[in-house]
Amino acid sequence: MEIIKVGLAAYGMSGQVFHAPFISTNPHFELCKIVERSKELSKERYPDATIVRSFEELIKDPAIELIVVNTPDSTHYEYARLALEAGK
């Protein structure tokens, strides 16, 4: 099985506690990009992941195969739709 290149849509509490640790410890996934609008909190724990500043920047990356939409609930539909339309 090939490794799936993953982008994480946010690095708030759920990204830090649940999503990034799961992705980074699962041998089938590679955490490649993380959206952090202003900070760079993920850099210490995930130095190989690239920090991007927007969701739009994340979905435009052709290398990203899967996007974890862990943003506030009110944005889930729109971000999931955009990710699916981008083939993620």
Predicted stretch roles:
Residues 1-46:
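N-terminal Rossmann-like dinucleotide-binding module
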Residues 49-88:
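Beta-loop-alpha module in the N-terminal Rossmann-like domain of NAD(P)-dependent dehydrogenases
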